[in-house]
Amino acid sequence: MSDKHIKQTVLNSNDNRISPSHVCDIFLPQNGLSERWKAFTRRRFVIAETGFGTGLSFLTACQQFTQFRQANPTATVKELHFISFEQHPLTKSDLIKATEKWPEFAHFSQQLHAHYPPAVSDCHRIVLDEGLITLDLWFGNITDSMPQVWTNDDGIVDAWFTDFSQIEAADIHQTTEGTTTESITIENNASESSATESNAALLKSLTIINSIAILARENSTIHAITYHQGNQQDVLEQSLTEAGFDMTESHNHRNSISPTHRLLVGSVKNRQYQANSKPWFTRTSATDASDVAIIGGGVASATTALALIRRGVNVTLYCADSLPAEGASGNRQGAVYPLLNGSNDCLTRFFGPAFFYARQFVEQAAMNSTFSHDWCGVTQLAWDEKSTSKINKMLSGNFPQELVHALDIEQTKQKTAITSNFSSVYYPLGGWLCPQELTRALIKQAQDTGRLTLKSDVDICSLESTNEQWQLTDSTGNQFTHNTVIIANGHRFSEFEQAKQIPAYSVRGQVSHIPTDDTLSTLKTVLCYDGYLTPQNTTTKTHCIGASYRRNSADLAFCEAEHQDNKQRLVHCIPDVEWPKNVDISANQSRAGVRCASRDHLPFVGNICRYEALIEQYKDLRDNQATAETVPIYANLYSIVGLGSRGLSSAPLLGELLASQICGDPLPLPHTVLNALHPGRMWVRRLVRGKQLGSKS
């Protein structure tokens, strides 16, 4: 089936099968949402559906929930979380066209359009109405995506919108290889090919039902539209019943669905409690998330604080300096673009969605604050054989053109408005921003809510667990008590006894500030080589080039050699033109900062593990994985460290991830990536292989 045919099928199926009034007639009442919202005792209500299409169900739910909140302002439920899956996502232009016919949803559809991502696989989190509504949009085959959705023992979904009749429509003319259909009988007179397709679609539906059951909470409701096709409907109903749903057929809305379809409704009874993560990668929420302390004053602290505050959490931010963003987040300009390769490994699967979320986050922040930034694009030069090979490998990943694409020499010159004599790749959605201004703007926004207390010049130097709370002691002996603590102080994480074994390290980086000139002032994009050069910051009339890289150094003093090397790398990488040689560094204007990095280029985000207990508990993990117990952790103690040089692209999603985990909300990344971000991952990898652990293994 061609992409064009699939796209038209999605558009037609959503336009012709159902309307906003039908959604209100079928999906919402059959799940009893209005009455359930009134009696709901949790802060966030989670709906999941099996096909996003044009977003009609999502938009209708947004409108209905908002109207409910307006009519019931004292209700406990404050937020709506919507999880949806789509194997064949529409382009943004097609989505806009499809939703134009529903002007009543304009408030929500315009926000959806603004942040709707390109067709990159995995989860894309979109936040609407300042966090009151959250959409997790999973692109890819639903049978691959659903097992990647994290859940705890209790489940995460409160209501399911499912349409099994669309499974077969989406899979027309697609063959399922290696599938056994011997146990399924479909009574029809169709051709052998048609029967095979129907059997494959049914097997896919059964796989989906298993995932639905794993993700559903106790008392979670479901509506399921199925085909009237032989005994297929009975197989699906039986499977839902065996999965824990008490199912009945609804005859109240026969005029709202096709006569060839059937509507089943039900709810979960006696759920079998089961998480879907390995015990050594467990992510535990806080036992009390009402009061959280964050140690640190950079962009990771600011994004995490704002994500928590959106969830109604009171946050105290302990900053060792007199002002936030005086450390690694204090630079004038930083590039924002994703770290991609052609392997579809955890780096790509994290940094792709993280970059899209960072753009969304920055654009939303800019609506309420002023900070220097420019989505001017990022150009990465193929300046030598190694960089060319790396770029070619990355391009083999077949990413959407709107994310990254190749430029020849002439196109590179036109795009950058500067001569380099190299081909390149271009990230059209990338750009630069001022990390210091952004961080301070975010903290100001958080303070304006009344939920953030900023304690400047308070250098927390030790933590102690006392009476199920954390006691924080600063450098002058003052003590503070909080229920939950987040360590987000960059390379200084190792000063805390509980976190010192996390295998991250410090990296000194010095950025040079250079005055603009006639050539540099024309630069239109961030230019990356074995270093980077930013376009002019119109506020300072300067550019940034850098940065040096000195591992295991926390020295902040100006270094003449590193200053010279910043220019020399520019000259070395772009040798055949004059303008790099004319860059003026004579004023010795620069800034040094210390980043916190990891060997695998991924941060450490989540529960902090008890290192010695982990070694003892998992000493035989290679041979006893089936009986392994949950990883030992420090209760209510978390980290967000090791962001390296990609903090601007990753911090917003990491802050959202950590806030989601602490508050027990659905997580915005697939299992595989969550495991790759776990603070204990490197220790567990060695233990699984039967290797011993040493210091910072």
From Swiss-Prot:
Residues 1-269 are annotated as: tRNA (mnm(5)s(2)U34)-methyltransferase. The gene is mnmC. GO terms for biological process: methylation; tRNA wobble uridine modification. GO terms for molecular function: flavin adenine dinucleotide binding; oxidoreductase activity, acting on the CH-NH group of donors; tRNA (5-methylaminomethyl-2-thiouridylate)(34)-methyltransferase activity. Residues 295-697 are annotated as: FAD-dependent cmnm(5)s(2)U34 oxidoreductase. It catalyses: 5-aminomethyl-2-thiouridine(34) in tRNA + S-adenosyl-L-methionine = 5-methylaminomethyl-2-thiouridine(34) in tRNA + S-adenosyl-L-homocysteine + H(+). Its EC number is 2.1.1.61, 1.5.-.-. GO terms for cellular component: cytoplasm. Keywords: Cytoplasm, FAD, Flavoprotein, Methyltransferase, Multifunctional enzyme, Oxidoreductase, S-adenosyl-L-methionine, Transferase, tRNA processing. It comes from Photobacterium profundum (strain SS9). SUPFAM superfamilies: FAD/NAD(P)-binding domain (SSF51905). It comes from the Bacteria. Its cofactor is FAD. It holds the Pfam family Methyltransf_30. Catalyzes the last two steps in the biosynthesis of 5-methylaminomethyl-2-thiouridine (mnm(5)s(2)U) at the wobble position (U34) in tRNA. Catalyzes the FAD-dependent demodification of cmnm(5)s(2)U34 to nm(5)s(2)U34, followed by the transfer of a methyl group from S-adenosyl-L-methionine to nm(5)s(2)U34, to form mnm(5)s(2)U34. This is tRNA 5-methylaminomethyl-2-thiouridine biosynthesis bifunctional protein MnmC. It is found in: Cytoplasm. In the N-terminal section; belongs to the methyltransferase superfamily. tRNA (mnm(5)s(2)U34)-methyltransferase family. HAMAP family: MnmC.
